Regions:
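Beta-strand/loop substructures that line and gate deep hydrophobic ligand-binding cavities in soluble
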Residues: 116-162
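Bacterial N-terminal signal peptides
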Residues: 7-17
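Hydrophobic ligand-binding cavity/cleft-lining segments
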Residues: 18-70, 196-197
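A conserved amphipathic terminal alpha-helix motif
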Residues: 8, 21-23, 146-197
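A short, structured loop/turn motif at beta-sheet edges
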Residues: 45-49, 98-105, 129-139, 165
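Short beta-edge strand/loop motif at the mouth of beta-sheet-based domains
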Residues: 59-94, 103-105, 184-186, 190-193
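Hydrophobic/aromatic beta-strand elements that line small-molecule binding cavities or substrate pockets
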Residues: 40-42, 68, 93-99, 123-132
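Positively charged n-region of N-terminal signal peptides that target proteins for export
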Residues: 1-4
Length: 197
Protein backbone atom coordinates (compact mmCIF):
# COMPACT_ATOMS: atom_id res chain seq x y z
CA UNK A 1 0.00 0.00 0.00
CA UNK A 2 1.14 3.52 -0.70
CA UNK A 3 1.27 6.02 2.18
CA UNK A 4 -0.19 9.49 1.70
CA UNK A 5 -0.22 11.96 4.58
CA UNK A 6 -1.83 15.38 4.55
CA UNK A 7 -2.17 17.59 7.63
CA UNK A 8 -2.66 15.39 10.68
CA UNK A 9 -2.90 16.30 14.34
CA UNK A 10 0.46 15.90 16.04
CA UNK A 11 -0.63 12.74 17.84
CA UNK A 12 -1.63 11.06 14.58
CA UNK A 13 1.71 12.05 13.05
CA UNK A 14 3.47 10.37 15.97
CA UNK A 15 1.45 7.18 15.48
CA UNK A 16 2.05 7.21 11.73
CA UNK A 17 5.78 7.75 12.22
CA UNK A 18 5.95 4.70 14.49
CA UNK A 19 4.47 2.47 11.79
CA UNK A 20 6.82 0.73 9.41
CA UNK A 21 6.28 1.24 5.69
CA UNK A 22 4.57 -2.18 5.57
CA UNK A 23 2.13 -1.21 8.33
CA UNK A 24 1.09 2.13 6.88
CA UNK A 25 -2.24 2.19 5.10
CA UNK A 26 -2.85 4.65 2.32
CA UNK A 27 -4.24 7.38 4.60
CA UNK A 28 -5.16 11.02 4.58
CA UNK A 29 -6.73 13.15 7.26
CA UNK A 30 -8.01 16.63 7.83
CA UNK A 31 -6.83 18.37 11.00
CA UNK A 32 -9.81 19.94 12.76
CA UNK A 33 -13.45 20.93 12.59
CA UNK A 34 -16.13 19.39 10.39
CA UNK A 35 -13.54 18.31 7.81
CA UNK A 36 -11.49 16.33 10.34
CA UNK A 37 -11.51 12.73 9.16
CA UNK A 38 -9.57 9.50 9.25
CA UNK A 39 -9.33 8.09 5.74
CA UNK A 40 -7.72 4.84 4.60
CA UNK A 41 -7.63 3.27 1.15
CA UNK A 42 -6.62 -0.07 -0.30
CA UNK A 43 -7.04 -1.99 -3.52
CA UNK A 44 -8.01 -5.60 -2.87
CA UNK A 45 -7.77 -8.62 -5.16
CA UNK A 46 -11.49 -9.33 -5.43
CA UNK A 47 -14.42 -8.35 -7.64
CA UNK A 48 -16.65 -5.60 -6.31
CA UNK A 49 -19.52 -8.03 -5.67
CA UNK A 50 -17.38 -9.92 -3.13
CA UNK A 51 -16.08 -6.76 -1.48
CA UNK A 52 -19.65 -5.47 -1.21
CA UNK A 53 -20.73 -8.77 0.37
CA UNK A 54 -18.09 -8.68 3.12
CA UNK A 55 -19.01 -5.13 4.11
CA UNK A 56 -22.80 -5.56 3.99
CA UNK A 57 -23.63 -9.01 5.39
CA UNK A 58 -23.15 -10.51 8.84
CA UNK A 59 -21.33 -13.56 7.50
CA UNK A 60 -19.14 -11.43 5.24
CA UNK A 61 -18.10 -9.06 8.04
CA UNK A 62 -17.19 -12.07 10.19
CA UNK A 63 -14.64 -13.01 7.51
CA UNK A 64 -12.49 -9.89 8.13
CA UNK A 65 -14.05 -7.24 10.41
CA UNK A 66 -14.79 -9.04 13.69
CA UNK A 67 -15.69 -12.43 15.08
CA UNK A 68 -19.41 -11.60 15.40
CA UNK A 69 -21.57 -9.28 13.32
CA UNK A 70 -25.23 -8.40 12.94
CA UNK A 71 -25.83 -6.52 9.71
CA UNK A 72 -29.13 -6.10 7.89
CA UNK A 73 -28.72 -4.08 4.70
CA UNK A 74 -31.48 -1.49 5.02
CA UNK A 75 -31.60 2.18 5.97
CA UNK A 76 -31.87 2.04 9.76
CA UNK A 77 -30.88 -1.64 9.76
CA UNK A 78 -28.32 -2.80 12.35
CA UNK A 79 -24.59 -2.46 11.70
CA UNK A 80 -23.35 -4.20 14.82
CA UNK A 81 -19.81 -5.51 15.09
CA UNK A 82 -18.77 -7.52 18.17
CA UNK A 83 -14.99 -7.45 18.55
CA UNK A 84 -14.91 -9.67 21.64
CA UNK A 85 -17.88 -12.08 21.80
CA UNK A 86 -17.36 -12.43 25.57
CA UNK A 87 -17.61 -8.67 26.19
CA UNK A 88 -20.77 -7.05 24.86
CA UNK A 89 -19.30 -3.58 25.53
CA UNK A 90 -16.55 -4.17 22.95
CA UNK A 91 -18.76 -3.65 19.95
CA UNK A 92 -21.16 -1.39 18.15
CA UNK A 93 -24.45 -2.68 19.56
CA UNK A 94 -27.41 -0.50 18.57
CA UNK A 95 -25.66 1.28 15.70
CA UNK A 96 -27.45 1.63 12.38
CA UNK A 97 -26.90 1.85 8.64
CA UNK A 98 -27.33 5.46 7.48
CA UNK A 99 -27.26 5.05 3.69
CA UNK A 100 -26.08 2.81 0.89
CA UNK A 101 -25.83 2.52 -2.89
CA UNK A 102 -25.37 -1.13 -3.97
CA UNK A 103 -21.78 -1.97 -4.86
CA UNK A 104 -20.76 1.69 -4.46
CA UNK A 105 -21.00 2.81 -0.83
CA UNK A 106 -22.39 2.16 2.62
CA UNK A 107 -22.40 4.51 5.61
CA UNK A 108 -23.10 3.58 9.22
CA UNK A 109 -22.95 5.01 12.73
CA UNK A 110 -19.79 4.31 14.71
CA UNK A 111 -18.61 4.54 18.30
CA UNK A 112 -15.39 4.28 20.29
CA UNK A 113 -14.19 1.76 22.89
CA UNK A 114 -15.93 1.87 26.31
CA UNK A 115 -12.85 3.47 27.90
CA UNK A 116 -13.58 6.60 25.80
CA UNK A 117 -17.17 7.37 26.94
CA UNK A 118 -17.32 10.90 25.55
CA UNK A 119 -16.45 9.67 22.06
CA UNK A 120 -18.36 6.39 22.37
CA UNK A 121 -21.60 8.33 22.47
CA UNK A 122 -20.33 11.19 20.32
CA UNK A 123 -22.09 10.45 17.06
CA UNK A 124 -19.34 9.64 14.56
CA UNK A 125 -20.01 7.76 11.35
CA UNK A 126 -18.14 5.83 8.69
CA UNK A 127 -18.48 5.93 4.90
CA UNK A 128 -17.12 2.98 2.90
CA UNK A 129 -16.79 3.66 -0.82
CA UNK A 130 -15.75 1.13 -3.42
CA UNK A 131 -15.10 1.10 -7.14
CA UNK A 132 -14.05 -1.69 -9.47
CA UNK A 133 -10.59 -1.69 -10.96
CA UNK A 134 -11.01 -4.14 -13.80
CA UNK A 135 -12.94 -7.34 -13.15
CA UNK A 136 -10.86 -8.78 -10.31
CA UNK A 137 -9.82 -5.83 -8.14
CA UNK A 138 -11.70 -3.27 -6.06
CA UNK A 139 -10.51 0.02 -4.62
CA UNK A 140 -11.95 0.65 -1.13
CA UNK A 141 -11.93 3.96 0.77
CA UNK A 142 -12.99 4.12 4.42
CA UNK A 143 -13.63 7.59 5.85
CA UNK A 144 -14.46 8.09 9.56
CA UNK A 145 -16.21 11.43 10.16
CA UNK A 146 -17.98 13.44 12.86
CA UNK A 147 -14.95 14.30 15.01
CA UNK A 148 -15.16 16.91 17.75
CA UNK A 149 -12.47 18.73 19.74
CA UNK A 150 -10.89 17.69 23.03
CA UNK A 151 -8.25 15.40 24.53
CA UNK A 152 -10.42 12.27 24.50
CA UNK A 153 -11.38 12.98 20.88
CA UNK A 154 -7.70 13.33 19.97
CA UNK A 155 -6.94 9.99 21.67
CA UNK A 156 -9.79 8.34 19.77
CA UNK A 157 -8.57 9.89 16.52
CA UNK A 158 -5.15 8.31 17.02
CA UNK A 159 -6.81 5.00 18.00
CA UNK A 160 -8.87 4.91 14.81
CA UNK A 161 -6.05 6.11 12.57
CA UNK A 162 -4.31 2.85 13.45
CA UNK A 163 -7.50 0.78 13.78
CA UNK A 164 -8.92 1.49 10.33
CA UNK A 165 -5.48 0.87 8.82
CA UNK A 166 -5.35 -2.51 10.58
CA UNK A 167 -8.85 -3.31 9.33
CA UNK A 168 -7.86 -2.59 5.74
CA UNK A 169 -4.88 -4.92 6.09
CA UNK A 170 -7.27 -7.65 7.30
CA UNK A 171 -9.56 -6.92 4.33
CA UNK A 172 -6.62 -7.44 1.98
CA UNK A 173 -5.64 -10.64 3.82
CA UNK A 174 -9.21 -11.90 3.58
CA UNK A 175 -8.93 -11.86 -0.21
CA UNK A 176 -5.40 -13.26 -0.41
CA UNK A 177 -5.44 -15.88 2.39
CA UNK A 178 -9.14 -16.54 3.01
CA UNK A 179 -11.36 -15.65 5.98
CA UNK A 180 -9.58 -14.47 9.11
CA UNK A 181 -8.87 -17.16 11.71
CA UNK A 182 -10.09 -15.31 14.82
CA UNK A 183 -8.37 -17.68 17.27
CA UNK A 184 -5.03 -16.97 15.61
CA UNK A 185 -5.84 -13.24 15.41
CA UNK A 186 -6.56 -13.09 19.17
CA UNK A 187 -3.27 -14.86 19.96
CA UNK A 188 -1.30 -12.44 17.77
CA UNK A 189 -3.07 -9.46 19.39
CA UNK A 190 -2.33 -10.75 22.90
CA UNK A 191 1.34 -11.36 22.04
CA UNK A 192 1.57 -7.85 20.62
CA UNK A 193 0.10 -6.35 23.83
CA UNK A 194 2.49 -8.38 25.99
CA UNK A 195 5.51 -7.17 23.98
CA UNK A 196 4.42 -3.55 24.48
CA UNK A 197 4.08 -3.90 28.26
Amino acid sequence: MKYILMTLPLAAVVVASLMTAQERPNMTAAETGPARAVRVEATVKAPISEVWRVWTTSHGAEEFFAEKANIRLAIGGPYEIQFDPKDERSGTKGLKILSYAPEEMISFQWNAPPEMPEVRNGGTWVVVQMRPEGTDRTHVTVTHLGWKEGLEWDRAYVHFTRGWGDLMKRLERRFTDGPIDWNKERMMYQESRERKS
